[in-house]
């Protein structure tokens, strides 16, 4: 009789876990939808990105003036003769992938499903403010490096 109760308890817990995870998935999808809608439509989101890249210009100018400054803490020896550089991640730093995120929500999918197809479409647009910043850095003679996990 004791083992029958244990089996019953295990079945009830298992069923509850499935209900909760299904509800959790729905809640996650709803939260994801709200964040994507905000990123795609809120003027504040775009303005914040522009402000970040405008501030990056200020800090870039400060770094170019101060020859002893480096963002690479592992650089311990003479590096002032090296060409200045910046490193940016591509996705969500340079390229806006919220259309991909919206697509996955509509289809009830999640990353990485459809990611390679999205990347190959080449439909991502620039994050607000980044193009101006990269042009600014390039005019200052700064080498630009991009980091990505995209398949080439």
What are these regions (language model features)?
Residues 2-10:
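Sec-dependent signal peptide recognition
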Residues 11-20:
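Hydrophobic h-region of N-terminal signal peptides that target proteins for export
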Residues 19-88:
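Non-catalytic pre-domain segments flanking phosphatase-related domains
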Residues 38-47, 116-124, 145-151:
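Second-shell loop/turn segments in exported
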Residues 54, 58, 128-135:
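Solvent-exposed, polar/charged alpha-helical surfaces in well-ordered, non-transmembrane soluble domains
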Residues 56, 60-67, 94, 98, ...:
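Sec/Tat-exported extracytoplasmic proteins
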Residues 83, 94-128, 132, 139:
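Active-site neighborhood of HAD-like aspartate-dependent phosphohydrolases
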Residues 92, 130-152:
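Substrate-recognition element of Asp-dependent hydrolases with the DxDx(T/V) motif
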């Amino acid at each position: 009789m004791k083992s029958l109760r244990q089996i019953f308890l295990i079945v009830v817990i298992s069923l509850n876990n499935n209900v909760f995870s299904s509800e959790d998935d729905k809640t996650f999808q709803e939260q994801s939808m709200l964040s994507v809608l905000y990123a795609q439509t809120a003027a504040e989101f775009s303005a914040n990105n522009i402000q970040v890249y405008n501030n990056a210009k200020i800090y870039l100018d400060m770094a170019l003036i101060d020859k002893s400054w480096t963002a690479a803490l592992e650089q311990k020896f003479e590096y002032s003769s090296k060409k200045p550089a910046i490193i940016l991640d591509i996705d969500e730093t340079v390229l806006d992938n919220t259309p991909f995120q919206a697509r996955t929500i509509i289809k009830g999918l999640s990353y990485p499903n459809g990611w390679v197809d999205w990347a190959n479409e080449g439909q991502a647009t620039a994050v607000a403010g980044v193009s101006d910043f990269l042009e600014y850095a390039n005019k200052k003679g700064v080498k630009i490096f991009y980091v990505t996990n995209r398949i080439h």
